[in-house]
Amino acid sequence: MATKTLMASCQCKNVQFTVAVPTECFPLNIHLCHCSICRYTHGAPCSFHAPLPVGVEPQFIAPSSLNKLTSYQHPASTATGYFCSTCGCQIGGADGQWVITPAIFDANREDEGIWKFNAHMLPTSAPDGGLAAVFSLIDGHRMEIENLGLSPQAIAGSDSQPPDPESKELLAQCHCGGVSFTIARPSEEFVASPRSKGWISPLDKSKWLASMDLCDDCRLVTGTHVISWMFVSIDHITPRL
């Protein structure tokens, strides 16, 4: 059976591997998962995942190995996610069958017919629909919507209700809660000072400026094609860094 070999690497290159995919299996379908597990483990609006054909697994390039990765599993998920222990990039996960992160296959980024953006999974987990509300059509293909297949905990998540719009603070934390802090709205003193330029939303001075980032470094550190950043003055973060 004819195969094509794809090569992946995280940002720091401490994780490198190949996958040999039967050519008859191309294109590999990509789904964007908006469940709270994926968003909070990636620190991104969603994850980008592509299931590998049955029997196809990553072949790590020495000194990379599966044992050198950091794994994470939550009771609400049956899959184990794997991350670079140095730069933090998620390379994929496994639950009998491997699901890989297509964002880190730079060696094949110019190859045609390898990937197909196919579906949004669990967009109802994000309070506002997340990127599913923005990218309903990709490469001329209308994205399918799937809201089944995961536990109620993964669908609802810890943020099933949007934050109170009148709240003066916003809680930020990773999925396991090991990193947790609060972000205060811009103070009146900060808004009035010259140093607020470039930090405050031009539409609402009670909100920090935020943006979508498509740069290579962010993509390879998170394992997602799109990352979001909010620009916050450090003196508005508690506890102090």
PLM features: what roles do these ranges have?
Residues 2-173, 178-241:
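A short Gly-Trp-Pro
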